[in-house]
Amino acid sequence: MKTKENFLQEYDIIDFHTHPFLEPKYDISFHKEYLRLTQEDTFRIMKNLGVSKICGSMLSADADVDGGDVWGHIKTLNRKALEMKRYYGDFYEVGMHIHPDYVQESCAEMEYMRKRGVKLIGELVPRRFNYDYTHKGLDDILELAGEYGMVVSFHSMDDASMDAMVERHKNTTFVAAHPLEKTTLLRHIERMKNNENCYLDLSGTGLFRFGMLRRLINEVGSERVLFGSDYPICSPSMYVGAIILDETLTEREKAWILSGNAKRLLNITQK
């Protein structure tokens, strides 16, 4: 008889969209007083679900910008992420922050982080840092991301600005976060059909709508969809179950979504 652990370990899962932390200040879960999560809990929870690697950026739960020093705040988040990489090792893939008001600083930071093995930018969350995807300062940053082969994860916002950003930078790989409701999902699909450099991760709202994943795969293919949970905001067990237990998916489709696409985009080699 298969146990839960044996069953889950059959799958190699990479959670492309998380916001892990080493200190309570950076725990952005909504009900943290009832969870009291630690960095050890993150590792245990994910490993028990068959997740072999997590990806993503750090965010601050206390304030969007510490003391008004936007760039200082961003740099602190990036250094904390590198510290977390030293703690977790291969379990964690760093996601770094940039800011279009600080183009030179962002480009220099990308070079610094790239030399330390960082391949992921984002999740970009403009509302936390008071900009949007129409900001002209993003152009040089996103072009450099393409040159460096870095993947850009971005929070779903208004469709027109997402369209323009992705279309302006054809040599840069983008992964939109959150399918959301049907209207937004359909626009994600349209954007992905029009731009081969655009993918979608399944974190946040949307995956619980039965049939949305089948629609997404039929329209753009399982090779364009990545597993993500948005941990610790969302419960990763719900997302693991939504993929593994979905009888409308083939095993091959599950494999692409759960880890195959993340491995390919981030050039990850593991089991």
Task: Identify what each model region corresponds to.
Residues 1-20, 25-53, 222-224, 237-271:
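Mid-to-C-terminal alpha-helical segments outside catalytic/metal-binding sites
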Residues 17, 46, 81, 113, ...:
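Conserved, mostly hydrophobic/aromatic
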Residues 18-19, 40-69, 92-97, 119-123:
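Divalent metal-dependent hydrolysis catalytic cores, especially in the metallo-beta-lactamase
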Residues 21-23, 61-65, 100-104, 128-129, ...:
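Active-site environment of divalent metal-dependent phosphoester hydrolases
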Residues 26-35, 62-75:
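Short, flexible/disordered intra-domain loops and linkers
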Residues 69-151, 207:
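Active-site gating/metal-coordination segments in enzymes
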Residues 119, 134-226:
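Catalytic pocket-lining loop regions of alpha/beta-barrel enzymes
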